[in-house]
Amino acid sequence: MTRALAFALFVSLFITTNSYAQRFAASGHLASSQWSEFDGTDIGGGGRFTFMPTPTIGVEADLTWYPGEFPPDGIPFTGNRFEGLFGVTAGPRLAGFRPFAKAGGGFMKVSESSQPIVCVAIFPPPLSCVMAGGPTMAAFEFGGGVELLPTGHALLRLDVTDRVLKYPGPSLGANFETNDDGFWGHALRFTIGAGWRF
């Protein structure tokens, strides 16, 4: 009898907690990203799926596609890029909005150059020539943002983060610095979007 009562209590607590805590959101966003080693702004679009196990913690997957050649000025080394970032947000839900801090990790897949580029036959090769080969780079982001919750299930969201990319090596940088191994570069990433909570 005691086991049955304990089991029933456990199940009721689990169901009550989950019915209160489980929240999902799906949204689309416009992304504007900088690169630490190249000039120009990378513009893309994507989607985000969020699971909120508690009212203050969110677990999310953020996928973004950057369709244009990059860099926009000069000789492009890539035709498009695909980015996947997976992480957590933490912040209180207040009256009509939720400020949050966030951290995550993932990847940035750079496509090969859509047209041939001329590379000087030196070692190490220029970074743009290494990037033209289409590497997949480790990516991290740290920052924060705010969700606006105007009415019902709708949401508007703004994120500002420091995106950290692991550039491949060996390579020669724009200022002729030599990188024998891969190296990390930091740059601003900004997204704005809208979605639906359910």
Segments predicted by a language model, with ranges:
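Sec/Tat signal peptide C-region and signal peptidase I cleavage site
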Residues: I15-A21
